[in-house]
Amino acid sequence: TNLDFIIGPLYPEQIAPLSKFCQQHHIKLVVPFSSLGDNVYENPYYYAINPPKSYQFAEASRLTTELFGKDNVIFLEGTENDKDAAAFIDATRKRLQQNGSKANRLKLNDDEIKWMETMTQYKDNVIIPNSSGIKLLNQLFPKLKEFTKKNPEYRIKLVGYPEWQTYASNHLENFYQFNTYANSTYYKNPLNVKDEEIDKANQNAI
């Protein structure tokens, strides 16, 4: 075969045989429509635009541990339940334990004394919320601003989720202020005019 790559297939049941074919013939396979199956683990020619969430969580937790494993990692519990966030936090917690590190836990509504006990002046405090929702951020940022105003010597970073990119119109300055990181398989630049043009075109097409 003289193919360089194949885009597809459309149906999930076609993925396994096509993946096998591409691996045998050294053809790159780009799968844009489905994240089902574990071919991404087994086939080096397999590129999943929407990879399995288990793979995303594993990679995100690995990068998080590499970047912040020596910092004061804090898992922040809000009032919402988020299965994806919980899976990411669990994977990160296990990786930290494997590396001999330990994360702290803090509740959003804990009092100031508890926040002071959990934070440290001697390391970066890396806060990972248990929700990707904007509701938690709306509650968290005022609390962080109040805390850092009273305690400017504390360094705080946030680690979050792909959805946070869509909150840039509300929280871009807050993201900058608290040195925010978000794991994601895509990136949307809120300051790029071309991104705005694409958004408008999509809205007009609906």
Which sequence ranges carry the predicted segments?
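Cysteine-dependent hydrolase recognition
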Residues: 75-77, 83-87, 91-106, 164, ...
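A short acidic, amphipathic alpha-helical/loop segment
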Residues: 17-21, 63, 87-91, 115-118, ...
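Helix C-cap/helix->beta junction micro-motif
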Residues: 25, 99, 151-154
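A short, well-structured beta->alpha microelement
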Residues: 1, 95-120
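Extracytoplasmic ligand/sensor domains, especially the bilobed periplasmic-binding protein
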Residues: 7-91, 165-168
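Extracellular/periplasmic periplasmic-binding protein-like sensory domains
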Residues: 141-206
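Glycine-rich, charge-decorated loop segments at or immediately adjacent to ligand/cofactor-binding or catalytic sites
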Residues: 40-45, 112-118, 164-178
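Periplasmic-binding protein-like
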Residues: 2-10, 29-33, 72-78, 123-140, ...
